């Protein structure tokens, strides 16, 4: 529950700003660096708006790492080289209502000291959902293309954009056949087009340097065709190798934006060449020479005349009423456009006004994005099913009468948990409003028939799969099955997790294969995977299996007889034991029997065992409790013993290099710009150092990035050596 601003204490506001900074940074990373968003645009925007409200109410609490100071996200570890933008690629502030657009216009007038009776024009264009890209032309020739990254540093994608037909390798100074500005939406929706019959002769006469900025995107039809082609190619490859085909293992892009980002950011440009990418321009960056125009309209028209596409819906608006009308007109066409958009961008037209208005921390004062609401539709909730996940969590899933939302037919929605069902008051038979935004799972946002006489949905208190008691965690909203590995749903999901890429990474055992083998009674526990060699003839008799595919599967299984110990521990699916925690545990214990013995002692109340576990950096009471509970359950112990009778995990050791930090304790603080926190920790371990999360008298070295706060001060007070990220990179490079 969000607390009203007037009821917040200063300490509460500071804590909330800290949480928001971390949340927004996480979602920025997922969206910009990993192309894998977890929340809708609307949910993200709500976090940003709350942060802005808090900073306005408590300006003295604005943090160094505030989202209001950042653009995009630092470039993650990538094979693509980094590019520093000469002129930062900024973000845009957002508006969500007509009143906010009106306030933007009024704010521009106040800043420029322009009265209501004096005309001021704006441009308006649709905001395409793509990947920002900057194209640097020198003397009319393309010399470099770079992604936005964090606005200051992006990735070099020059070889990749050479395969995008919309991006010319050389600009041609063509005059326009017709203008872009002013008129209403025309029937064709065409952009300003060059007239080849009026080609200028002679050498390039434009600016010596001109950076065109815009969006790389993928048309909706091309996106669907690409996913279909990737599926067909994977099926053909499986047939050629006589492997069983598993659709679950085929890479499918979630939406056109992710497809565009994933296709452009390829180390091998020949992959990009096979992807149907497009581009259009909406602005510019660094310029050496004269800007070819005095208004936004004039420069955009000149860019189009040079042969670079611009938005077909780009217009000049003389009044606020025209701006709002153009937003409505674009919104009315949204479902029929051949590409996905998420709003309309307004910019002050006169460039001298833009220069006077300048920028705030991460956005220009002279532009704003009016966002569209998430796409919604009405339908009937026909049923509510309960699914049981790998960790026993009971998740309600709504089954819908099929409905088209945002160009996609939706039949299922997540209802999250018992509390969400109670909040919405939904029951089978209700009419509901369904919302879909981006690649996030569709969700019910409103119940249209809450007052109709119908029995409330009763959330089960027993597991629908095994009949074990289902209980709520103290202080939590989730309901979980207590059956553990005796629950068939948990067993199949845990088997899938066990063979996943993060765990044992066994090729040939996809989700459908595991479901099939489980139904046949061949797979009950992880150890059964290593007994599949005894069922070769039975597998071969199944439809779709050939000698080669069976042999490939069995060879992949046999290759994991001596698995990495931390991966094996991760594969068991113990609650709260992820990849990092599994590595941390095995670095301390080295062998699995030692871990089990300590966990069992800790559950029995042995204080020394509890101290041993919690002394491991990153291991808290939740992990200790989860380990104890796992080994306390008799069936889990049987599964563990059975598995270790089939595999022989070697003693876990971390290979280290000779380095000046070997044997020392290193702490990382502040914003790391060239690596993630996990990467930094892994580097420290490889150099023989211990990476700690807190500064103490035992700390030997602090690596401080931008925004370093209390840890830096404490280190300085204790006389601990402090270096920046570049200094750390030198240590890593020197160690080889």
UniProtKB/Swiss-Prot annotation:
Coiled-coil regions listed: none
UniProt cross-references to SUPFAM superfamilies, sorted A to Z: BRCT domain, DNA ligase/mRNA capping enzyme, catalytic domain, Nucleic acid-binding proteins, RuvA domain 2-like
An annotated GO cellular component: cytosol
Keyword Chloroplast in record: no
SMART domains xref list: BRCT, LIGANc
Cofactor(s) listed: Mg(2+); Mn(2+)
A biological process term (GO) from this entry: DNA replication
NCBIfam families registered for this protein in UniProt: dnlj (TIGR00575), PRK07956.1 (NF005932)
Entry protein name: DNA ligase
Organism: Erythrobacter litoralis (strain HTCC2594)
């Amino acid at each position: 529950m969000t607390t009203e601003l007037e009821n917040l204490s200063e300490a509460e506001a500071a804590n909330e700003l800290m949480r928001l900074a971390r949340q927004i940074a996480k979602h920025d990373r997922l969206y910009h660096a990993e192309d894998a968003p977890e929340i809708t645009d609307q949910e993200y925007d709500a976090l940003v708006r709350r942060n802005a409200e808090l900073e306005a109410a408590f300006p003295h609490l604005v943090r160094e790492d505030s989202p209001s100071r950042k653009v995009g996200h630092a470039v993650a570890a990538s094979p693509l080289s980094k590019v520093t933008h000469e002129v930062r690629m900024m973000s845009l502030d957002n508006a969500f209502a007509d009143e906010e657009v009106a306030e933007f216009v009024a704010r521009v007038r106040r800043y420029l000291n322009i009265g209501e009776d004096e005309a001021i024009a704006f441009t308006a264009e649709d905001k395409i959902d793509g990947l920002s890209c900057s194209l640097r032309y020198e003397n009319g020739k393309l010399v470099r293309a770079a992604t936005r990254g964090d606005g200051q540093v992006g990735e070099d994608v020059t070889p990749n954009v050479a395969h995008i037909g919309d991006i010319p390798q050389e600009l041609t100074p063509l005059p326009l056949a017709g203008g872009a500005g002013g008129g209403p939406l025309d029937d064709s929706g065409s952009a300003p087009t060059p007239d080849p019959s009026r080609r200028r002769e002679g050498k390039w006469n434009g600016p010596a340097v001109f950076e065109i900025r815009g969006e790389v995107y993928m048309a909706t039809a091309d996106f669907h065709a690409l996913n279909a082609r990737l599926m067909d190619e994977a099926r053909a490859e499986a047939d050629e190798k006589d492997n069983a085909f598993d659709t679950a293992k085929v890479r499918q892009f979630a939406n056109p934006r992710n497809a565009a980002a994933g296709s452009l950011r390829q180390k091998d440009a020949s992959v990009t060449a096979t992807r149907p990418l497009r581009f259009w321009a909406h602005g510019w960056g660094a310029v050496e020479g004269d800007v070819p125009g005095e208004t936004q309209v004039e420069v955009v028209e000149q860019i189009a005349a040079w042969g670079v596409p611009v938005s077909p819906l780009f217009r000049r608006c003389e009044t606020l009423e025209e701006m709002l009308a153009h937003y409505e007109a674009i919104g009315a066409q949204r479902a029929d456009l051949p590409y996905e958009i998420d709003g309309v961008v307004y910019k002050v037209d006169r460039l001298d006004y833009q220069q006077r208005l300048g920028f705030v921390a991460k956005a220009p004062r002279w532009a704003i994005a009016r966002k569209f609401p998430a796409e919604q539709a009405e339908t009937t909730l026909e049923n509510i099913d309960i699914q049981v996940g790998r960790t026993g969590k009971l998740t309600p899933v709504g089954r819908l009468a099929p409905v088209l939302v945002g160009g996609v037919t939706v039949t299922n929605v997540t209802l999250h948990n018992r509390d969400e069902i109670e909040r919405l008051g939904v029951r089978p038979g209700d009419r509901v409003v369904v919302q879909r935004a981006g690649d996030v799972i569709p969700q019910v946002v409103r119940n249209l028939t809450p007052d109709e006489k119908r029995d409330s949905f009763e959330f089960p208190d027993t597991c629908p799969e095994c009949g074990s008691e289902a209980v709520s965690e103290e202080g939590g909203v989730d309901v979980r099955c207590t059956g553990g590995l005796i629950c068939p749903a948990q067993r199949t999901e845990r088997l899938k997790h066990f063979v996943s890429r993060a765990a044992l990474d066994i090729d040939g055992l996809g989700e459908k294969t595991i479901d099939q083998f489980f139904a046949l009674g061949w797979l009950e526990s992880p150890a059964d995977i290593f007994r599949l060699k005894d069922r070769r003839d039975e597998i071969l008799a199944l439809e779709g299996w050939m000698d080669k595919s069976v042999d490939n599967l069995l060879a992949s299984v046999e290759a994991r007889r001596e698995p990495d110990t931390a991966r094996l521990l991760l594969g068991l699916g113990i609650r709260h034991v992820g990849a990092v925690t599994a590595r941390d545990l095995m670095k301390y214990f080295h062998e699995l029997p030692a871990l089990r013995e300590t966990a069992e002692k800790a559950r029995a109340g042995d204080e020394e065992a509890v101290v041993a576990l919690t002394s491991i950096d990153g291991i808290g009471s939740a992990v200790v409790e989860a380990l104890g509970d796992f080994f306390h359950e008799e069936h889990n112990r049987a599964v563990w013993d059975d598995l270790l009778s089939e595999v022989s995990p070697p003693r876990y050791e971390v290979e280290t290099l000779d380095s000046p930090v070997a044997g020392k304790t290193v702490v990382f603080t502040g914003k790391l710009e060239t690596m993630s926190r996990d990467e930094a920790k892994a580097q420290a371990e490889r150099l023989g150092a211990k990476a700690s999360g807190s500064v103490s008298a035992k700390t030997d070295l602090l690596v401080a990035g931008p925004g370093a706060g209390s840890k830096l001060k404490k280190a300085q007070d204790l006389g601990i050596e402090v270096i920046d990220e570049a200094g750390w990179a030198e240590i890593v490079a020197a160690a080889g």
